[in-house]
């Protein structure tokens, strides 16, 4: 699965509303023989400048001296692309950086520096081996001749900062990238200058742990959206082996806050899709629960655990609710894709003691003795929710306060299932 997925193309899709997408002809295919992109056309970026479109991408070639290099293609209409005969246009500086990781170029015009910038993911030779990941800067006046500047960010916490990009919102500059480490995530840093220094905000994640390799764009109204990928799993099972690559996620919108942070929220376009009210029933399973009218469920879990299910017939829906907790010192949450025993499911968990919101895959690993002693629980086999959003801002889980929850669930189409194979 892994080697086959490396020989990627650049697919091209467009949308007017972030929900409905039209596929256009494939923009770039891998090369042949010993060409620098013969083993795959990896990620990069596109800019319109100097009278035409320019794509800078990672050329991958297993048989080349430098397996990962920066390649270039141009287009007059953004649809049909011609590769640069001079490819690769930027190769690793092996006296300073490793050969292996030299990729993920991000190009933009820096108004403050009055030239084009290109950011490259790399690994410094003068750093500890698992902490060498850095972002290297080149500059150009014409998108053809590039001058080396040096590492613009070396966090010392990652093997490689994948898919970096930089942009300005308000008075702040933002540098985002996907952290390839044991703490995998798409994260961001903030600075007053594009040259740094880059500071870590209190909450630096864009999306959850599996919202990865995310790249953003800004529309004509100044709204910025991140487009990322959720790793898929073998057999489309929540218990399957994690694969490299994955499924296109619901876009995430980011909004700058007064303190320089980024709030992440669901684009309003998705809420407009689910405008029809869905009738539902509460089906109690365990504990003490009472339905008030047709909109309020009250649960009393003193000395017990209380849960039940919402009965309805929809395959794709949006669940919006308010949760108010009282005298809760453990956790509460929402079960997703659960069996009746709530033993094989996903749990959107609000942990009061830890002040943490998590999407937990149950059952979790336990001591081997208990695994052998307990009844076997079949794993969930259906794909998980497309996206989960918990409020739009950082919040405290406190007694008597309301928590707004918005959750999307869409069943995969047969075409999506076929694509995953």
Model-identified regions with their sequence ranges:
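Secretory/extracellular carbohydrate-interaction modules
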Residues: 300-369
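Entry beta-strands of beta-propeller and related beta-repeat scaffolds
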Residues: 52-55, 114-118, 172-174, 223-225
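Conserved small/polar residues in nucleotide/adenosyl-binding loops
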Residues: 409-416
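Beta-propeller blade signature
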Residues: 11-15, 70-77, 134-141, 188-193, ...
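Short, aromatic/His-centered strand-loop micro-motif at the edge of beta-sheets
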Residues: 368-404
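Surface loop/turn signatures of beta-propeller and other carbohydrate-active proteins
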Residues: 2-3, 19-48, 79-109, 126-129, ...
């Amino acid at each position: 699965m892994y080697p086959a997925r490396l020989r990627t193309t650049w697919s091209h899709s467009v949308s007017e509303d972030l929900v409905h997408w039209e596929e256009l002809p494939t923009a770039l295919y891998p090369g042949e023989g010993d060409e620098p992109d013969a083993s795959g056309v990896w990620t990069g970026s596109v800019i319109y400048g100097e009278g035409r479109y320019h794509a800078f991408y990672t050329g991958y070639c297993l048989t080349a001296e430098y397996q990962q290099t920066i390649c270039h293609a141009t287009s007059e209409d953004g649809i049909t692309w011609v590769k640069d005969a001079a490819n690769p246009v930027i190769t690793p500086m092996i006296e300073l950086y490793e050969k292996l990781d030299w990729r993920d170029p991000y190009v933009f015009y820096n108004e403050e520096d009055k030239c084009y910038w290109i950011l490259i993911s790399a690994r410094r030779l003068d750093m500890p081996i698992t902490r060498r990941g850095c972002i290297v800067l080149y500059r150009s006046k014409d998108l053809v001749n590039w001058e080396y500047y040096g590492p613009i960010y070396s966090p010392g916490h990652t093997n490689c900062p994948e898919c970096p990009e930089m942009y300005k919102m308000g008075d702040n500059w933002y540098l985002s990238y996907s952290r390839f480490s044991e703490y995998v995530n798409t994260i961001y840093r903030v600075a007053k200058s594009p040259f740094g220094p880059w500071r870590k905000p209190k909450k630096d994640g864009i999306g959850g742990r599996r919202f990865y390799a995310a790249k953003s764009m800004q529309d004509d109204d100044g709204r910025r959206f991140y487009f990322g990928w959720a790793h898929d799993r073998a057999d489309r099972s929540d218990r399957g082996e994690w694969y490299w690559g994955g499924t296109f996620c619901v876009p995430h919108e980011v909004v700058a806050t007064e303190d320089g942070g980024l709030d992440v929220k669901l684009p309003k376009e998705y809420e407009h899709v689910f405008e029809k009210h869905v009738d539902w029933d509460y089906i109690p399973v365990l504990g003490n629960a009472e339905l008030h009218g047709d909109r309020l469920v009250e649960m009393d879990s003193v000395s017990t655990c209380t849960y039940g299910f919402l009965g309805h017939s929809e395959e794709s829906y949006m669940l919006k609710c308010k949760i108010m907790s009282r005298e809760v010192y453990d956790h509460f949450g929402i079960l997703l894709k659960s069996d009746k025993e709530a033993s094989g499911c996903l749990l959107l968990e609000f942990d009061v003691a830890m002040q943490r919101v998590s999407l937990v895959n149950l059952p979790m690993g336990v001591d081997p003795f208990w695994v052998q002693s307990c009844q076997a629980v079949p794993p969930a086999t259906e794909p998980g929710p497309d996206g989960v959003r918990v409020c739009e801002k950082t919040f405290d889980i406190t007694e008597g306060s309301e928590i707004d929850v918005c959750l999307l669930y869409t069943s995969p189409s047969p075409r999506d299932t076929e694509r995953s194979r």
